[in-house]
Design a protein with these regions (language model features):
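Short beta-strand elements at the ligand-binding edges of bilobed clamshell
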Residues: 51-63
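Hinge/cleft segment of the Venus flytrap/periplasmic-binding protein
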Residues: 68-118
Length: 118
């Protein structure tokens, strides 16, 4: 923070980044409010949201991954669409992109999603 004192926010993109960012900020001489966002709903990350060290955690809806995978496998095996050779561009019942949604956790909604943390 000494090199870039105008930094207003830092984002982390894996489950360990929130801890690393907050540890780095605690050990720096930063004297202004720096917004922190990170990925993955992990217990340590939720505690950092609760303490106010992290502003937002973005979580994936992991249960939806399994649902869509099972649904697509079912469609492959029970669809009227024939999947002959996907490598040569035949029609597929599997979409190119599947949006599974995200959960945004902050101090305002933390206990709504995780009431046992109260």
């Amino acid at each position: 923070m000494e090199t870039h004192p105008d930094v207003a926010g830092i984002s982390g993109f894996n489950s360990n980044s929130a801890i690393g960012i907050t540890n780095g900020l605690r050990s720096s001489s930063a004297d202004h409010d720096i917004k922190v966002t990170a990925m993955d709903i992990e217990p340590d990350n939720l505690e950092l949201v609760e303490s106010g060290d992290v502003d937002v955690i973005i979580g994936q809806k992991r249960a939806v991954f399994t649902y869509y995978a099972a649904s697509m496998l079912y469609d492959i095996n029970h669809s009227s669409i024939t999947v002959n050779n996907l490598a040569k561009g035949a029609a597929s019942v599997i979409p190119d992109t599947v949006y599974t949604g995200l959960i945004t956790v902050n101090r305002e909604n933390l206990y709504t999603y995780f009431p046992d943390m109260k």
